[in-house]
Amino acid sequence: MKSIRHCPAVLIAAPASGQGKTTVTAALARLHRNQGRKVRVFKCGPDFLDPMILERASGAPVYQLDMWMVGEQESRRLLWEAAGEADLILIEGVMGLFDGTPSSADLARHFGVPVLGVIDGTAMAQTFGALALGLAKYQPDLPFAGVLANRVGTLRHAQLLEGSLTEGLRWYGALSRETGIELPSRHLGLVQASELNDLDVRLDAAADALASSCEVALPPAVEFAAPDVLEAEPLLAGVRIAVARDEAFAFTYGASLDLLRAMGAELSFFSPIRDTELPEADSLYLPGGYPELHHVALSQNTSMLTAIRAHHAAGKPLLAECGGMLYLLDSLTDVEGTRAELVGLLAGDAVMQKRLAALALQSVEMPEGLLRGHTYHHSLTSTELEPIARGLSPNGGRGAEAVYREGRMTASYVHFYFPSNPSAIAALFAPDLKDAFASKLAPTVDGVVPEEMRSPVGASLLAKRP
C-alpha cells in the first residue's frame, strides 16, 4: 500500500490574470515563514518569473506543477515530497481559475487541494459576490475554501464586499490598495526578483498587511499519495555542462537542472554579460531570459562571443532556448530600434515587438524523441535556416515553433521541460553520442544501469525513449 502524507495546502486562484495572485501567495508564504513554519510553494503552469518572487518569499525552491507539461505522476511526486517536509503547501494558479487546458481548477480537483479565490476589488461592490459565487459553483466538485479581496480602498469598501457574499461563502479578508506591496512588471511578466532591491521590504509589508486584515490560520490538511518512482539512468555521468545564469539568462526550470544532476552531469554557472570565458565544459546550455534588455552589454563582451563560437567549432553540444537562441543570432534589435551584433552562429536576425508574438504549450518531436515545453516571447526572428522540427500546441495556442540545428547546436524559441524525456535531453548534451548511446538506443533501467549507479528523480522518467 502506498504511503499517504498529510499537509495543510491551498491553491490561490483568481477570475483572471492581474488580480494579485502572486502578491497574495508571496504574502502568505512570507507571513508563515516569519512565524517559523516551513513553507513550500508551487506555481501552476510553465511560468519562470513568479517562482523567483515566491522563492524569496518562502526561502525554499519553487517548482512548476502542470498536468500536461510536468505530468500527473511528476506533479504527484513533487507534492508528496513537499508534504514530507513542509508545514504548509501553497500553489499559485495561472491565468483565471478555469482558463486553459489543463487549468488550475483541474489540478486543484485532481489532488483535492481547496481553492482560495483572490478578486481585485477595485471599483467594485456587490458584483464581488457574483464573481465569488461563480468561482465557487461553476464546477460543483471543485474544493473551494473561500475568497480574499485584493486592492481594497477603505474599511467601508471591505464591508460592502464581504456583505455581497452569499450561500455561506467564507470571507478571508481584504488586502488594502498599497503601492508598497505591489510587485512591478514588464512585458514578460513580473520584474525578476534579483532586480528588486526592496523586494524583502515589500514582502514583509505585504505579510504584515495580510496578518492585520485577513484570516491567516493554516488551512485543513490534504492527503497526498505517494507516486510511482523510477530511477535516473546515469546517461550524463561526468559530463560537464556550463549553464548561462545572470540577469539576461535566468529562465531555467529547477526540475530540469535537478534531472541533469541526477543523470550524473556536473553543472557550472557563468555570466555571458560579465565573464570573459566559459567554464571548463563538455556541453553548453543557454536558457531564456531578457537578452533584449542587455543586448548591448552582451555584444560588447567580445571575449565571451569568441568563447561560444569556439565551443561550437569544437563540435561540442549546445542547447539554446528562446533568449538563448536570440543570443546566437547575427543581431538583436530592441523596441527602441537599437541593434546589437551577437554571437552569429545562427544566420538570422531578431527584432523585439511591443505586442506578444507567441504563447503556447509545445510538444516537439525531435530526432532524439518527444519533448514538451512552452513558448512565450515578444520577438520576431527572420532566418533562411530550415528547421529540423516544429512544435505543436496541445490546446491550439499561438505558436508552432521551429527547432534549428547546426552540427551539435540545437536552438528554438521553446523552453523545454527536461523531465518530459530524460534520454532525449541526455542525447542533446552528451559529448559523444556514439559512446553515450551505443547498444542502448532504447535503454531500460534493469538492462543497462547497475543498481549502485541509479539515483531517484521521480515518475517523470516514464517518458518516451529515443
Predicted region positions:
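Intrinsic, low-complexity polybasic segments
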Residues: A438, P450, A459-S460
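ATP-dependent carboxylate-amine ligase catalytic core
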Residues: K2-F111, I119-L142, L155-Q159
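Internal gly/pro-rich beta-alpha loop/helix module
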Residues: A125-E233
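Amide-donor transfer/coupling interface in amidating biosynthetic enzymes
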Residues: E182-V229, P234-G238, A350-K434
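A short helix->loop->beta-strand "cap" motif at the edges of active sites that frequently abuts
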Residues: V113, L169, A313-P317
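Short, low-complexity intrinsically disordered segments enriched in A/P/G/S/L with frequent Arg
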Residues: L441-A442, A463-R465
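Cysteine-nucleophile active-site neighborhood
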Residues: L267, P291-P367
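Phosphate-binding active sites in nucleotide-utilizing proteins
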Residues: V239-A313
